[in-house]
Amino acid sequence: MDRASENRRLAAVGKPVPGIGEMGNRRPLRDINNLVGAPPHPSAIAKKPMLEKSGKEEQKPALVVSHRPMTRNFAASLTRKEQLDHQVSVADAAVVCTDPQKNPIPDGTVDDDVESCESNDYIAVDECNDTDEDESMMDIDSADSGNPLAATEYVEELYKFYRENEEMSCVQPDYMSSQGDINEKMRAILIDWLIEVHHKFELMDETLFLTVNIVDRFLEKQVVPRKKLQLVGVTAMLLACKYEEVAVPVVEDLVLISDRAYTKGQILEMEKLILNTLQFNMSVPTPYVFMRRFLKAAQSDKQLQLLSFFILELSLVEYQMLKYRPSLLAAAAVYTAQCALTRCQQWTKTCELHSRYTGEQLLECSRMMVDFHQKAGAGKLTGVHRKYSTFKFGCAAKTEPALFLLESGAGGYNLQKQPC
C-alpha cells in the first residue's frame, strides 16, 4: 500500500495525518525537522539487536558490507584485521597466564592452552632445525639447470673422473733431490716470476695452474741446469696458453719478457722436449678445476673467491705444498678463506659433501696456508701479495689471516671453538 492511499484512509476516519499541520500543508519531505513522515532509507549497517534478559554481554556485530567487490586489497585488509585480532587475544591470554593470583582461572581452561602453546613452540624449533639441515645440504646445481654450459646432468660424473685421475697431476714431494743444479728456492723464484708474467699478460686463471703443473712434472722427470730453468718456465707458460687461451702470446713476447735471455729457436726446442717428456699429456686436473666447484658449494661471493685464490696462489710458490693433492689444496684454500672472513671455523655439510673432505682433514694444510698468508708481504718473493693488493683483486691480500687456527693446534679441530 502506497503512502497517498494511507493518508486518504486516515483522513476519512477523522484521524490526524502525520506530517500535516493546521493549514493542511505538508512539510517538505527533506526538511530535517520532518522526521515522522520521511520514508525509511535503506541502511547498509545492520541494527544492533536488543539485549536478552539472560545478561549476556553484547557481542560486537560484524561489519556487513553490501555491494562491495572482493578485491585483493580488500581481502588483504580483512586478513590483516583477523591477524591483529588474533594477536591481541593471544597477548591477553599470555597476560592472564603469567599472573594467576590476580586472575583466578578455572582448572582445565587456560592451562591446557598454555601447554598446547608450549608444545607448538617446540614443534616450531624442530621445524627450524629440519630446515637448517635441509638448507645445509642444498643442491648447488639447481640454479644452472637451464644453462647447457654448466653440464648439470653429468657434472657429478665429471668431478668423479677428476678425483680418480688427479694422481696423474701429482709429483713426488721430494723430486728436487734428483736435481743437482737447482733447489727449492730457485723453484720458488721461478714460480713467483711466472705469476707476475701471468698477471702482466692478463691470462686466464687456469693457465697459471697448468703452467706450474707442467713445470713440476717436467722437473720430476728431467734434470735441468740452472741457466735453463727460466727457459722451462717460459715454455711451460707457452704450452699452457696454447691449451687454455683463445689468444696465445707470440713467442717474441716471451723472448722480451725474459729479457732476451733465450732465443725463439731455444723456446721452440724446449717446447718439443717438454711435450715428448710428458708424452703430450696436457689434460690433467689442477687445483683450479676443484676450486670452481668448491667455491660454488660454499656459495661464495666475490670477496671469498678472491681471497681463496690469493691463498691458493701463495701455495703454488711453496715446494712443500706438493705433498697435497690438488683437490685438498683447493678445499683447504676455501676453508682458510672462510675462516679468515668469518673469524670462526666454518665448513658446511654441502662443502664436505662436494669436496669429500672434513674440516679436520683440512686443518693441517689450512694452518700452513695461514702461515703463508701471514708472511706474504715479507721477504723477497712478494709477487702474489702485490698482485692481490690491487683494487682489481679486491685488496684480498690485506685481509687479516685466520691466526686462531694456529692457536687451536693443541686442541685439535673443534667447529664450535670460535663462535661465529
Swiss-Prot record:
Identify the domain of life.
Eukaryota
Fetch the Pfam families from UniProt: Cyclin_C, Cyclin_N
Species name:
Oryza sativa subsp. japonica
User: Record's Gene3D superfamilies?
Assistant: Cyclin-like
Q: Which GO terms describe its biological process?
A: cell division; G1/S transition of mitotic cell cycle
The Basic and acidic residues compositionally biased stretches are: 49-60
What induces or represses this gene? By gibberellic acid (GA3).
- From the Swiss-Prot or TrEMBL record, give the protein name: Cyclin-B2-1
Q: Which family does it belong to?
A: Belongs to the cyclin family. Cyclin AB subfamily.
Tissue occurrence:
Expressed in the root apices.
